[in-house]
Amino acid sequence: KNFKFKTQTELAQFLLKIATCADEMNHHPDCKIHKAFQLEITLFTHDKNEITDLDHQLAEKINSL
């Protein structure tokens, strides 16, 4: 999923919220910053080589932020 922000500070604050959720779940997304104000989040369980329930749960938490 892609997110756009007005400032880098807003992006960083949102990324910190995602990191906090990810740490609580011990399940971490791939995050890429594009053009300083765009954040791309990818959820995939690499050791299972598929999208799992944990990915869906983390996606729900991210969507609720």
Residue ranges, per PLM feature:
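Charge-rich alpha-helical segments
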Residues: 1-65
